[in-house]
UniProtKB/Swiss-Prot annotation:
Cofactors (names): [2Fe-2S] cluster; Mg(2+)
Disulphide bonds in the chain: none
Associated pathway: Amino-acid biosynthesis; L-isoleucine biosynthesis; L-isoleucine from 2-oxobutanoate: step 3/4; Amino-acid biosynthesis; L-valine biosynthesis; L-valine from pyruvate: step 3/4
Annotated cofactor note: Binds 1 [2Fe-2S] cluster per subunit. This cluster acts as a Lewis acid cofactor.
Molecular function (Gene Ontology), one example: 2 iron, 2 sulfur cluster binding
Record's protein name: Dihydroxy-acid dehydratase
PANTHER family: D-XYLONATE DEHYDRATASE, D-XYLONATE DEHYDRATASE YAGF-RELATED
């Protein structure tokens, strides 16, 4: 066992002495040491109860013959961090979480790992760190929250609350109506109830085989979720000494491919592209945006969940058959699903999905009745995004899939919010928000506030938005993000001027600005990218080391 390095031999008497101080005895030194990376934090609805899941996991590990050691990571709630300087810390927190997992696991030479994440950057951060450690690992998330409901029974979620702000600003709803939405949108603990970033990443963990079936869709704070935690903890002990289940043996090119298949079939958050680029690099099987676009062209979009379809939430998809049913339906197009990929249960993906059935063909549609013959995410290229940009096609109205608009430029999210609220954005505009990329922000803020304002103010079918920042998984509409190169590194998005004509053509996978190469070259002659001092030593370091979105916004280490 790896942990023998800290517990075997006379030389390790001091180490054992310290371990005895934590309650270990002679018999424990013969057992596998299992790390539990928890992300309990009181302020996040999907995490405030994870301390109890950690306790359950420890109990099960002991019963199964292991010795548990629980430790914690930090966490950021993107919804609470939204719309102010706190959002600059969200994406950087992914790197801190990955580093902390690597640090604790390798410093103490633990044999296996149970990861208990749930929201936003915590899932990919844990997965990146666990891949570096490369011990047998099982993921079990905290689970999605229930959908909220208004007094008339209408299902709502957090995105409803964000869009309600725009409606209130326009006088379309009253303070009382806004208050009802505020009080009902998030009715329980759990990750926000739609196919937002947290649930998207938890679904992808299931698709990659690093989590048990149900990980992405079983509701939080239910007996079924608790049982999932128990099974995951026991499984970590069972595989602790089995080389087949070292994490990089599971998260290989086939598993990453399957994750992107499910992502496209379910129209996941655009943030999944950013995270899977980063995860694939840690796995030693790097994806590119071209790879992702190739997969998108072969996978039908068969499930729509909020925000793409406001009435459908994760609990509905679970009742309809969950991720196994989605994979099984996608696999009907031969060769799309890599069915030989091994999962943490010891089954292959093919074996896992063989008995899956779709209980509601309107929620998980057959291929013959797909929403689209291609995936719910798309990668765009063009002179405005030479290295690529990402759009959630699942959330775009058909009338906006091809759109040309007049650029109105903002050099920060704050400027854009003020401009939208102040009535500067009109039908026919193509909003440009720049200097919000990984380096320029720094931190690549999510643009849920401006996109929700656009939708809430009734501009969703007449205004598009493009940014080198990113979006919440709750964003919908003609919103293109992750533009690379970003403005801060000299990207063309920094050269766009008010009045330029910008075109998005989803079918052609194109994002262009109608400005000649000669004119762009002329503008570049006097162009100096803006530099923003974040007033934080951590964010300064982050800005210095981070790559652009086309590379997953990972930190460079080669120049250190």
């Amino acid at each position: 066992m790896r942990s023998d390095r800290i517990k075997k031999g006379f030389e390790r008497a001091p180490h054992r002495s310290l371990l005895r101080a934590t309650g270990l005895n002679d018999g424990d030194f013969e057992k596998p040491f299992i790390g539990i990376a928890n992300s309990h934090i009181d302020i996040i609805p999907g995490h405030y109860y994870l301390q109890e899941y950690g306790r359950i996991a420890k109990d099960e590990i002991r019963k199964a013959g292991g010795v548990p050691f629980e430790f914690n990571t930090i966490g950021v709630d993107d919804g609470i961090a939204m719309g102010h300087e706190g959002m600059r810390y969200s994406l950087p927190s992914r790197e801190l979480i990955a580093d902390s997992i690597e640090t604790v696991m390798n410093a103490h030479q633990l044999d296996a790992l149970v990861c208990i994440p749930n929201c936003d950057k915590i899932v990919p951060g844990m997965l990146m760190g666990a891949l570096r450690v490369n011990v047998p690992t099982v993921f079990v998330s905290g689970g999605p929250m229930k959908a909220g409901h208004l007094h008339d029974g209408t299902p709502i979620d957090l995105n409803t609350a964000f869009e309600a702000v725009g409606k209130r600003a326009q006088g379309q709803i009253t303070d009382a109506e806004l208050y009802e939405i505020e009080c009902q949108a998030c009715p329980s603990g759990g990750s926000c109830s739609g196919m937002f970033t947290a649930n998207s990443m938890n679904v992808l963990c299931e698709a990659m085989g690093v989590a048990l079936p149900g990980n992405g869709t079983v509701l939080a704070l239910t007996p079924e979720r608790e049982a999932l935690v128990r099974r995951a903890a026991r499984r970590a002990v069972e595989i602790a000494a089995d080389e087949r289940f070292r994490l990089r043996n599971l998260v290989n090119r086939d598993a990453i491919h399957n994750a992107m298949v499910v992502d496209m079939a379910m129209g996941g958050s655009s943030n999944t592209v950013l995270h899977m680029l980063a995860i694939s690099r840690e796995a030693g099987a790097p994806l590119s945006l071209r790879d992702i676009e190739e997969i998108a062209g072969k996978v039908s979009h068969i499930a729509k969940i909020a925000p793409s379809l406001a009435t459908v939430h994760m609990e509905d998809i679970h009742r309809a058959g969950g991720v196994p049913a989605v994979l099984r339906e996608a696999a009907r197009r031969g060769g799309i699903v890599r069915e030989d990929a091994l999962t943490v249960t010891g089954e292959t993906v093919g074996e896992r999905i063989r008995g899956a059935r779709t209980a509601d063909p309107e929620l998980i549609r057959p291929l013959e009745n797909a929403y689209s013959p291609v995936g719910g995410l798309a990668v765009l290229f063009g002179n405005l995004a030479a290295e690529g940009a990402v759009v959630k096609t699942a959330g775009i109205q058909p009338s906006m899939r091809t759109f040309t608009g007049e650029a109105i430029c903002f050099d920060s999210q704050d400027e854009a919010i003020a401009g939208i609220m102040g009535g500067k954005v009109k039908p026919g505009h193509f909003v440009v928000i720049r200097y919000e990329g990984p380096k320029g922000g720094p931190g690549m803020q999510e643009m849920l506030s401006p996109t929700s304002l656009i939708m809430g103010m009734g501009l969703g079918e007449s205004v598009a938005l493009v940014t080198d920042g990113r979006f919440s998984g709750a964003t919908r509409g003609a919103c293109v993000g992750h533009v690379s190169p970003e403005a801060a590194e000299g990207g063309v998005i920094g050269l766009v001027q008010d009045g330029d004509r910008i075109t998005i053509d989803v079918a052609a996978r194109a994002l262009t600005v109608d400005v000649s190469d000669a004119e762009l070259a002329r503008r570049r002659e006097g162009f100096r990218p803006k530099r923003r001092d974040p007033g934080s030593s951590w964010l300064r370091r982050y800005a210095h080391l981070v790559t652009n979105a086309a590379n997953g916004a990972v930190l460079r280490s080669t120049d250190l």
